[in-house]
């Protein structure tokens, strides 16, 4: 079992398999060029899997594959199968923008993937092109349909932004309901790589908009994640509300970047590398680094909206 110095059980590992993305979303990585790591600096899937096996043996129970856009990483389904074959009951998920999903969903399911989160910020083609700086909507919608047709469990992620998609929150909720998928509205998380003029909606503003049509009822708050679950009449949806709902006291996660950096907190600059250890096949050393990262995991993150602090690490490096 993995326990940090504050007594928190750490059982959730988020793995960014690539920094690359085929979108240029305003809230994440709107400008180019980027400081991508050279390919040789990235851990191979075999190297990542050496660490994943050790992490599972130490107590990791949930793994999420992120990016960048993870479907840009060649042979991702092979990596998924490695993990699934090693521990078939692991809670294994992917977060994707959905653009390539139609082509890869079947392979991912056959490899053992059971669920995924898909970004969907708008149902309007013009807005989608503005947000992603690319004509993406038809491909994303096709990817959603393909995943659902394969009986993969789908959650839709929507970053709620003022003057961009705030007039679509109800229609997005209704779209998700029609697809029998859960939608999760996300408070915009400030970071130094986002377009500077963006303004996000807070939880109460999201609820206020949805309340124009629906009776909104709080069902529960997840004590291990910044998500609150609500009902709009008979439909359950989520709000990921890091501004409004501090969950540091029960945080259960660490992050691994594509180049092998173990990151204790999204809003914490310090990180340690497992690259040398796994490339030598030294699992004992990798586990010792993991334990040191847990000792370094802060009690609270350094993010304060009041103090106008933002993340200096790009989310495309860590998966958000």
From Swiss-Prot:
Source species, domain of life: Bacteria
MF annotations from Gene Ontology: 4 iron, 4 sulfur cluster binding; cyclic pyranopterin monophosphate synthase activity; GTP 3',8'-cyclase activity; GTP binding; metal ion binding; S-adenosyl-L-methionine binding
Radical SAM core domain boundaries: 5-225
Record: residues binding S-adenosyl-L-methionine: 27, 68, 119, 189
Binding positions for GTP per the UniProt entry: 14, 64, 95, 155, 253-255
Entry's cofactor comment: Binds 2 [4Fe-4S] clusters. Binds 1 [4Fe-4S] cluster coordinated with 3 cysteines and an exchangeable S-adenosyl-L-methionine and 1 [4Fe-4S] cluster coordinated with 3 cysteines and the GTP-derived substrate.
Pfam families assigned to the protein according to its UniProt record, in alphabetical order: Fer4_12, Mob_synth_C, Radical_SAM
Protein name in the entry: GTP 3',8-cyclase
